[in-house]
Amino acid sequence: MAADRIDVIHKFLCEAGLADQFHPSYTRMAPAHYVTEIALVGCPDPNPTYARFFAPRRNALPADVAEIGRQYIGAVSRDIGKWLEARAASGPIGVCFSGGIDSGSVFLLTYHAMLRLGMNPARLKAFTLSVDGGGEDLKQARRFLAALDLALFLEPIEATAADVDWREAVKVVEDYKPLDIQSAAMALALCRGIRRRYPEWRLLIDGDGGDENLKDYPIEENPELTIRSVLNNLMLYQEGWGVDSIKHSLTYSGGLSRGYVRTYAPADVMGFDGFSPFTSPSVIEIAEGIPFIELTDWRHDRLYELKGQIVAAGVTATTGFEMPVFQKRRFQHGAAERRHAAALFPAAESEYRRAFQEAWNP
């Protein structure tokens, strides 16, 4: 059986009188960019096999930040335009917005595309989560939009600490990776807040995937990573270590292929139709063509600066806006005051794993 959630498989087996044959670890997440083949040959069932269908060419672009930005953001803009015409031709559109590089560029590109397509930009809102009235994201969102004379589009979504429930997020995401669960808990609070205010709202767009494409994660925080492993491996942040790696989970895929549930599932359970243009293959293909080694010379600081340079240059080339660029901040760290955010989530991964097991064995 194929489904988008583990609990759907569980429900089907229960209804078929086969509940005793279920365990969440028996399921297999289909990895992004592969065809998954399952051989139905009887007991014992063999593991699936995987055939890659998407293999972008690395280092295909010139070491020119302006040209890279033009191509990269141009691809994002085209996909947003296609989405607007095919799936979002009518009804209000919400941007999950922090004023960061990814959500900021998505807002500006969506606004620009709507004008280009003759759509009414009054349909657009920038939704920013603020927990207990705090968080740097709301301040940043205000600065971002004010700098471009677009402040009228901002709509803060207020939540309380009680609205941020990491145990609920574990059940919704059906996973236990701490950073993904923390992000999903904030996404649930945001989506629930929007739903309470606008019962009929359907469309959301966000910037998930932008960090993975431009390799903008602090390498120092992960003892398994070096800048050489990040820059030498094809789509490392999108796919993890790869389906043939000893580090690859049997149940889950890796990288954003696994982690994207943090964005998809909260929106889905709250009744939204979401879109993340940075995850489009056409966009990832251009990102993988960036000559990162030549542009960074293996330096962490240059790598962390590169994303803002590329995206800002591309946004200017595509829309004419001079986009403000702020320092990277995770969703769970920006939506609440930093000193309070730590109290919302347990520090140990074992707590998340325990909650995951309890969800299936109450």
Would you name each region that the model predicts?
Residues 1-92, 269:
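RNA-binding accessory domains that recognize and position tRNA/RNA substrates
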Residues 4, 27, 122, 328-329, ...:
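Short, intrinsically disordered low-complexity segments
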Residues 55-319, 332-346, 356-361:
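ATP-dependent adenylate-handling active sites, centered on carboxylate activation for C-N bond formation
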Residues 320-327:
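A short alpha-helix-loop-beta-strand transition element characteristic
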Residues 347-351:
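Non-catalytic structural connector segments
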